[in-house]
Structure formats: structure tokens, C-alpha cells
């Protein structure tokens, strides 16, 4: 049950988190918008489309910056309460540190639910629409992304790619060749395609050729062959969603597909488990702020708290990236690579709180 003090603490933290989040997202949006100037003028891509693209990527930024905003917002709000001795008064009135911690976590819960909702049902749609719109404008309409794949025009060829795994890997590719009278004369299908940066070319694997004659269809098969095309990884990558932009359910289904086709899933599994454990990461950030306020940051300035929060948030990011990539490289289960950073910081929180226990 939420009492008056819970609401007071929650209101203070919510306001600080919202202000911090809007600041971080706003700075990111400005940087992205400036970056788009390099593409303005290509194809039909203009300044207004750059504005739309930037706006559509804001939901992803909200999810990305939320853990940092939770840490900084909680530090600022709790720090203000501590500097006005309000936390001391609460404890004197019987509102223990544990109860204050529970009040902080109650505040985090609806925010975490909100970010998970937009991550599942908002971000994949807005990110895909943003990339599709931008790619269509930059390519002059020669690339079109649909629900089941990507269509591209390549001279007299029309290419359909079922899945763009990343910028340099494609799955289930169909290449249709037409003559000057727009008659279909060749159909090529490949299970996979990979791009070599050194040789600057695509290689198709498990290729099936169908040449359509007037009276017959001639079929041949090849294990691999070079694909001469104007479609570069940059063009195809413009319409492919990054793993971090996929929903949890989308990642789950995509991982299942990769397993069925015998492909490496470690990178996608790591992203999947990080999304699952994001509520834990947010809770850790807010409890870390609480442990600092009850400890060494009780009486310092707001600026010092912000700098400390940025440093700690960056440290968490570095530890998260190092342990995550280590799990991918050495074949450690991805669930450990996603969870261990939070567990390490929980140990740090326990140590800070126990060291400062009255």
C-alpha cells in the first residue's frame, strides 16, 4: 500500500528521472539530426524527412537511456531530499532505509513496465518505418522493405531478400531477371549471401538457376558463385533492424530461425537476455543511487552527484559490454553474460550499504 511518504519520494524521483531522460534523449536527437545533414540531398531525402527520421528514433533512445536516467534521476532526487535533511527526518519518524528503498523500487516499477511495452510494441515498428522511409528516399525508390522481406531494383534485375541478418549477411535471396520487353527470362535463388569487405563482393551459396526458354525451363545448381550487383551492405543495412531494435518475441523467433538454419545465435541471445533482465538493471541503478546517498554523497553538491552518476553509469556500461562480448567469444551461456554485471553491482550496493550502516 502506498502511503504519503511513498508518494512524496516517488513524485520527487519521477520528476528528476523525466527531466534527465528528456535531456539525454534531446541531446541524442540533436546529434542524430546533425548527422542526417550528410545524407540530405541524396535521392529525394530532404530536411523534413531528416526531422521525421530523427523523431521516429526517439522511442529507441528512451529505452537506451532509461537505465542511465534512472540512476541520475534517483541520485538528483534523493540527493535533494538528503541535502534538506528530509531523509533524516523520515528515518527519525520510523521510515527506515529499507522502506525508503521499497519506495524507490515502487517508483521504478511502472517506468520499467512502460519501457518494456514500448520495446515490445513500439520500437520495432517506429525503427522499421524510419529506416524504410529513409532508405526509400535515399535510393530513389529502388529499395522497398515489406513485412516479409526487402525488394530492390538492380538494373534489369529485381531482388527479393527474405532476411537481412546484418549488413553483410543475407538469407533466402531471389533474383529475377527481365528482358527489354519486361519478360521474365531468369530466376536465381540462393539460400545465403555473404559480403567480403576485402574483395568488395557478394558470394551466393547453394544457388539454383532457372533459365526460362520459350518451350522449356533449364535448371542448374551451384554450391557458390559471385554475385555482381550494385546493392552494397550500406544500402541493404539501411532497411535492416539491429538486434537491439527487435522486440523480445521478435528476437526469440529470429533465434529459433537461426538455430534451424545452423547459424550462430550467440550475439542475438545476448541481446535477448539483456532485454529480459533490463528491469533488473534499472533496479540496480536506482538502488545504487540510494546506497550513494546514504553513504559518501549525502552532503556533496548536485554537480558532484551528477558527475558520480555519469561515471558509475559508464562503468556499468563498460562492464556490461566486456562481460557480454566475453560470453560471446568464449561460448559462455548468454544468460550469464547479461546477468553477471547486475549481480556484481548488487554486491557493490550491499557493500556500500553495510559499510555505512548505523
Swiss-Prot record:
InterPro entries the record matches: LptG, LptG/LptF_permease
Bilayer topology annotation: Multi-pass membrane protein
Annotated disulfide bonds: none
Residue runs in coiled coils: none
GO aspect biological process, one term: lipopolysaccharide transport
Transmembrane regions: 13-33, 62-82, 100-120, 276-296, 306-326, 332-352
GO CC terms of this entry: ATP-binding cassette (ABC) transporter complex
Subcellular location: Cell inner membrane
Keywords: Cell inner membrane, Cell membrane, Membrane, Transmembrane, Transmembrane helix, Transport
Pfam families associated with the record: LptF_LptG
Quaternary structure and partners: Component of the lipopolysaccharide transport and assembly complex. The LptBFG transporter is composed of two ATP-binding proteins (LptB) and two transmembrane proteins (LptF and LptG).
UniProt record similarity statement: Belongs to the LptF/LptG family.
Its job: Part of the ABC transporter complex LptBFG involved in the translocation of lipopolysaccharide (LPS) from the inner membrane to the outer membrane.
UniProt protein name: Lipopolysaccharide export system permease protein LptG
Primary gene name: lptG
Amino acid at each position: 500500500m502506498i502511503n504519503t511518504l511513498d508518494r512524496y519520494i516517488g513524485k520527487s524521483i519521477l520528476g528528476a528521472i523525466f527531466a534527465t531522460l528528456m535531456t539525454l534523449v534531446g541531446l541524442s536527437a540533436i546529434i542524430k539530426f546533425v548527422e542526417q545533414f550528410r545524407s540530405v540531398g541524396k535521392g529525394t531525402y530532404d530536411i523534413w524527412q531528416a526531422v521525421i527520421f530523427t523523431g521516429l528514433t526517439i522511442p529507441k533512445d528512451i529505452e537506451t537511456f532509461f537505465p542511465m536516467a534512472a540512476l541520475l534521476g534517483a541520485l538528483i532526487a534523493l540527493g535533494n531530499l538528503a541535502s534538506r535533511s528530509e531523509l533524516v527526518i523520515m528515518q527519525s519518524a520510523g521510515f527506515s532505509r529499507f522502506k525508503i528503498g521499497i519506495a524507490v523500487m515502487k517508483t521504478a516499477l511502472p517506468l520499467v513496465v512502460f519501457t518494456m511495452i514500448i520495446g515490445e510494441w513500439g520500437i520495432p515498428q517506429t525503427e522499421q518505418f524510419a529506416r524504410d522511409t529513409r532508405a526509400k528516399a535515399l535510393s530513389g525508390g529502388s529499395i522497398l522493405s515489406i513485412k516479409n522481406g526487402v525488394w530492390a531494383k538492380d538494373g534489369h534485375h529485381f531482388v527479393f531478400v527474405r532476411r537481412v541478418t546484418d549488413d553483410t549477411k543475407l538469407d533466402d535471396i531471389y533474383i529475377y531477371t527481365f528482358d527489354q520487353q519486361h519478360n521474365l527470362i531468369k530466376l536465381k535463388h540462393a539460400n545465403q549471401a555473404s559480403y567480403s569487405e576485402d574483395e568488395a563482393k557478394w558470394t551466393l551459396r547453394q544457388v539454383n538457376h532457372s533459365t526460362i526458354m520459350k518451350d522449356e525451363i533449364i535448371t542448374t545448381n551451384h554450391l557458390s558463385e559471385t554475385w555482381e550487383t550494385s546493392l552494397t551492405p550500406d544500402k541493404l543495412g539501411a532497411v535492416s533492424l539491429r538486434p537491439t531494435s527487435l522486440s523480445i518475441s521478435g528476437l526469440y523467433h529470429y533465434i529459433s530461425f537461426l538455430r534451424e538454419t545452423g547459424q550462430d545465435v550467440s550475439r542475438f541471445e545476448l541481446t535477448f537476455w539483456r532485454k529480459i533482465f533490463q528491469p533488473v538493471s534499472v533496479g540496480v541503478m536506482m538502488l545504487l543511487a540510494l546506497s550513494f546517498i546514504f553513504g559518501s554523497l549525502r552532503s556533496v553538491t548536485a554537480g558532484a552527484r551528477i558527475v558520480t552518476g555519469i561515471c558509475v553509469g559508464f562503468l556499468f556500461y563498460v562492464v556490461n559490454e566486456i562481460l557480454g562480448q566475453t560470453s560471446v567469444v568464449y561460448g559462455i551461456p548468454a544468460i550469464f553474460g547479461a546477468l553477471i554485471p547486475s549481480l556484481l553491482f548488487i554486491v557493490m550496493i550491499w557493500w556500500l550499504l553495510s559499510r555505512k550502516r548505523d
